[in-house]
Design a protein with these regions (language model features):
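Carboxylate- and glycine-rich phosphate/diphosphate-binding segment that chelates Mg2+/Mn2+
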Residues: 1-54, 141
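Short, surface-exposed loop/turn motifs that are enriched in glycine and acidic residues
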Residues: 8, 12, 48-56, 68-75, ...
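Catalytic-loop motifs flanking and including active-site residues across diverse enzymes
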Residues: 18, 58, 77-81
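Buried hydrophobic packing segments
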Residues: 22-25, 44-48, 62, 66, ...
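Structural motif
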Residues: 32-38, 71-73, 144-148
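C-terminal charged capping/lid subdomain of soluble metabolic enzymes
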Residues: 101-156
Length: 156
């Protein structure tokens, strides 16, 4: 589930538990009832803990940038950014958006990215060195240069 150099058994267990709960939630026909929403909240907690204990992922540096620049909730910015990172997470992307389609959940693009915002988004993304280095290696700045970050944000 998790990848990166700082993975550990504790984070892996949290991630697996989160995924089990998310799958149950998304497969329910009436997912918006209070009991299912409680399960999703717990799953979200487990996922957040897994990420914080393993420092993995490209989504969160991009998502944090999007949240801070556009003042949108973290969960929504994760979903929006996920579309731009599809090539890094093909299997996970397909699973999540198949579940969304099954539930008729749409992720609206509520942001307008212009050239004035791109520089801020780039700088805000790149300051998250630990997860970027963990996911892409110590030369992450070569693998994730301005043009690549620009194209990822423009694709969402």
């Amino acid at each position: 589930l998790l990848n990166g150099k700082k993975r550990n058994i504790y984070a892996d267990k949290l991630a697996k538990k989160s995924l089990v709960l998310i799958k149950k939630f998304l497969k329910e026909k009436k997912y918006k009832n209070i009991e299912n929403l409680k399960k999703l909240m717990i799953a979200s907690f487990f996922a957040g803990e897994a990420i914080s204990f393993s420092m993995v992922g490209l989504i969160h540096p991009f998502s944090a940038a999007l949240s801070s620049i556009f003042r949108i909730p973290h969960c929504l910015s994760n979903c929006i950014v996920f579309r731009g990172l599809k090539s890094y997470y093909i299997k996970e992307y397909n699973f999540l958006f198949n579940c969304f389609n099954h539930q008729k959940i749409t992720i609206e693009n509520i942001i307008k990215i212009n050239n004035n915002k791109i520089e801020k988004l780039y700088l805000s993304t790149m300051k998250h060195e630990k997860p970027l280095k963990n996911h892409l290696g110590k030369n992450f700045k070569k693998k994730l240069n301005y043009d690549i970050v620009y194209n990822i944000f423009k694709s969402i």
